[in-house]
Amino acid sequence: MIVGTAGHIDHGKTSLLRALTGIEGDRRPAERQRGITIDLGYLYADLGDGSPTGFIDVPGHERFVHNMLAGASGIDCVLLVVAADDGLMPQTREHLAIVELLGIRRALVALTKIDRVEPQRVQQVRTQVEHLLASGPLARSPIFPLSSSTGEGVEALREALGGLAGEVRERSREGYFRLAVDRAFSVAGSGIVVTGTAFSGQVAVGDELLLGNAGRPVRVRGLHAQNRPAQQAWAGQRVALNIAGERLALEQIQRGDWLLQAALHAPTTRVDIDFRLLPDELRDFIHWTPVHLHLGTQDVTGRLALLEGEQLEPGHRAFAQLVLNAPIQALHGDRLVLRDQSAQRTLGGGRVLDGAAPARNRRTPARLAQLQALRQESLEEALPTLLGAAENGLDPQRLVQSFNRPREHWRLPEEVVEVQTRLGPRLFAGERWFALVEQLLAGLRRFHEELPDELGPDRDRLRRYALPQLERPVFIALL
């Protein structure tokens, strides 16, 4: 299990983790000097179930929300920290909104610094927290009043975390491996090490992977999973990979890179999403507004084009297309957060629907029908509508990449027809394919009726006459 903290600056997140685990997280000299968390901290502890639980300590200051977002991606549970003396503060609310946008549905609340206030104040803040959570997906999350200084209440929270670790289901190992890089450093005698959370699949020593948007080939020389040496690691674990590659330099690796198998490598600058504007926003969201995108550990600027109108009211959702200033890696179902142009305010977020979004015809009824189908969680649920709207069939390799579903894990309906073209296989609904055959024959008959003295048309002329909308390789396969 991976637990991430959330909460306002100076509410005691780092102190609480130290009290829970007895371990001081990774901290920079500047953090020790200033007494605040600036970047992400990592530590591991056995909570009693025999396996290490990973903790990610995130900064609470509003200037470092981008670091908090990098740490929150891929966690199983959030530990929301609220100080009893301060109560709810701006970053409490923003961190909670981010956690909900990222789809995190397990939370424990630590009500810290109770040794500094009267019992009435503790109850007052507890009620505030309950009201804050009541309308969202984390309603009825347990609240633990405690003091990291005296130790009061810490054991109860530790036991609750241990119990939760037993409830968290191991993530599926199906799919290709990908890891969101949050750190890279050099170890004497070993070379370059990258760390991050494994989002999908599994990896083993000796595997070949691609690094970053450039797709630089690297080999896994060694690895740690949940801070322990291992031969394999898989989705849902914190992983450190010792990697090597031709002319690979530490300066070429940065937070935001992905380390993944070749089948998933598809950098993109256009992503269609299911976007939700936070209800606390004071004004409508306007089409083509500049935004900051946070996905995994990536942080990229761009603009958001609304696909169903020119503006969106607070609390509402709509299809939208991100047009980015730099390429990213994005798969169907990935959770994302959008902040304003100055990165001062969280606007909303949502899910990736299509990581290879079209630049043209993005608002047509047919395209919106495809996006409606892509709101489904699984490939099997989305496939019937996608097939019905695909004039030239579906590229199965693109579906493999978009849904991270290797072909051996597919369950295609019997009526689906797979056609081999010069560009590779295409999938058609059987009804659609046989309708194309009829259109082809009808076009050929019409040609001979209208031009009885001419010889039969050549291939390209027949395509223009009968099925001009069909791509040439698909038409050749139809013949």
What are these regions, as identified by a protein language model?
Residues 1-58, 62:
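Conserved G1/Walker A P-loop phosphate-binding module
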Residues 5, 116-122, 128-131, 143, ...:
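C-terminal effector modules of nucleic-acid-centric enzymes and ribosome-associated factors
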Residues 9, 36-38, 44-49, 70-74, ...:
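Conserved catalytic network of the ASCE P-loop NTPase/AAA+ motor domain
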Residues 10, 16, 35, 57, ...:
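Residue-level signature of catalytic and energy-coupling elements of molecular machines
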Residues 51-53, 58-63, 72-96, 100-124:
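Conserved Switch II/interswitch segment of TRAFAC-class P-loop GTPases
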Residues 52, 101, 203, 208, ...:
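Residue-level marker of beta-strand positions
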Residues 61-62, 85-89, 104, 113-118, ...:
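Conserved nucleotide-binding/hydrolysis micro-motifs of P-loop NTPases
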Residues 114, 131-281:
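Conserved catalytic-core segments of large NTP-driven translation/proteostasis enzymes
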